[in-house]
A protein has these predicted regions:
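Peripheral interaction segments used for macromolecular assembly
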Residues: 1-121
């Protein structure tokens, strides 16, 4: 089923992972490293956006609510309505620790930071 922007609503995770994330001006601020799924609510809990670091060292991983990312075919990237500095100030953790305690602690912080509507009940 097409969305209002003409895209279908179904997308493979393998197409999302590795896609660049840009700010509204088209500047690259990171890329989607992973998707965290919520098996209880059958939803994407958040996309993991990584940036910073050199050769994999010092990279920060930010849980970004899926609803916050918007794919822009002109940029061939997901666009987030934040600057790199705002993303740097967002909640972050090691990629392994993002799922600690079922991910709910960092999930709540991320949804608050991005002012995203919670999907869970």
């Amino acid at each position: 089923m097409p969305t209002t922007s003409g895209h279908t609503t179904a997308i493979r995770a393998s197409r999302v992972i590795g896609t660049e994330v840009k700010d509204n001006g088209g500047n690259v601020i990171g890329k989607v490293e992973d998707l965290i799924l919520d098996k209880t609510d059958n939803a994407i809990m958040f996309a993991v956006v990584g940036f910073g670091g050199v050769l994999g060292m010092g990279e920060k991983f930010h849980p970004v609510p899926w609803s916050t990312l918007d794919f822009d075919p002109e940029f061939n990237a997901y666009v987030i309505p934040l600057s790199k500095e705002q993303l740097e100030a967002a909640p972050a953790d090691s990629i392994k620790d993002l799922t600690k305690n079922d991910g709910s602690g960092i999930r709540d912080k991320a949804y608050d930071y991005y002012k995203a509507e919670p999907y869970w009940h």
